[in-house]
């Protein structure tokens, strides 16, 4: 099976066309692709006047244009790849509610028969089981100081709202709890298969401090919002053949036990600025 992996496209700033010149079977979108709330607030055009305005590039507010850009992007991906697997990053939930954002993305992806949005979900393609989720961090294994400090340090906890707790923003304790539930979900799924079954984990936050760029290695607290140390989990589950992530805007490709861990982020592009991430638009992974 041939897989193309991309993450951190940030289509809210600029468009991109992901091609399939190598005949890949699966495209993985490992998070931070678009903002879910934009899709909810700006549904697809329903009349010819709106469609004409979009075609001409007129009459669009920024967020409406972003929503249409994302829908067009999904259409192109659906056309060019036999299968598309998409997990949300943290940016997907900006300016909206967490669980509502998941629902919005499920709804958009469900419009295409070969695009699968995963959040504590699986998709079987040929003989490979794909397990996907944002996989938030454990905040340095629920370290109290990290939980307290991240609330003031990261945008996630200022502009993502919690759905069921009144009008409050997401907290580090919320994501640490979500991390625990996702890992338990992955374990439960794998326990239901024979040991020779091949798995691919599609996530956004990183599963190892090996995905930390050296220039940030000293920042223990902030790294708690980017990385979790899942080395033992990975070593205990050698049936995971590939683990993809995004979030950090630096590419990584390394092995833990029998699991290949890969990150291939584009990063920000806007108004002539192109972030130097070192991403590979022609990457092909094999499982």
Walk through the language-model features, giving the residues of each.
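Short amphipathic alpha-helices and their capping/turn segments at secondary-structure boundaries
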Residues: 14-22, 72-76, 117-126, 131, ...
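Active-site environment of divalent metal-dependent phosphoester hydrolases
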Residues: 10-16, 34-38, 91-101, 122-124, ...
């Amino acid at each position: 099976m041939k897989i193309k992996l991309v993450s951190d496209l940030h289509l809210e700033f600029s468009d991109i066309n992901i091609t399939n010149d190598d005949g890949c079977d699966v495209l993985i979108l490992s998070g931070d692709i678009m903002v879910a709330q934009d899709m909810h607030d700006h549904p697809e055009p329903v009349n010819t006047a709106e469609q004409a305005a979009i075609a001409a590039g007129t009459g669009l507010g920024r967020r409406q244009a972003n929503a249409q850009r994302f829908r067009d992007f999904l259409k192109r991906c659906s056309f060019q790849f036999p299968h598309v697997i998409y997990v949300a990053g943290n940016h997907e939930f900006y300016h909206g509610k967490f669980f509502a954002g998941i629902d919005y993305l499920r709804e958009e992806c469900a419009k295409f028969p070969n695009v699968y949005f995963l959040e504590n979900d699986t998709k079987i393609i040929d003989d490979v089981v794909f397990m996907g989720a944002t996989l938030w961090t454990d905040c340095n294994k629920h370290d109290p100081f990290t939980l307290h400090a991240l609330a003031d340090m990261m945008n996630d906890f200022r502009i993502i709202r919690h759905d069921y707790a009144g009008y409050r923003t997401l907290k580090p304790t919320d994501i640490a709890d979500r991390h625990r539930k996702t890992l338990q979900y992955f374990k439960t799924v794998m326990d239901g298969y024979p040991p020779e079954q091949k798995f691919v984990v599609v996530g956004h936050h990183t599963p190892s401090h090996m995905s930390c760029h050296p220039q940030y290695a000293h920042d223990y607290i902030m790294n708690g919002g980017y990385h979790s140390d899942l080395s033992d989990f990975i070593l205990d589950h050698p049936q995971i053949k590939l683990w993809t992530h995004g979030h950090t805007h630096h590419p990584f490709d390394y092995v833990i036990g029998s699991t290949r861990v890969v990150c291939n982020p584009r990063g920000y592009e806007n108004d002539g600025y192109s972030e130097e991430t070192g991403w590979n638009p022609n990457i092909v992974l094999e499982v």
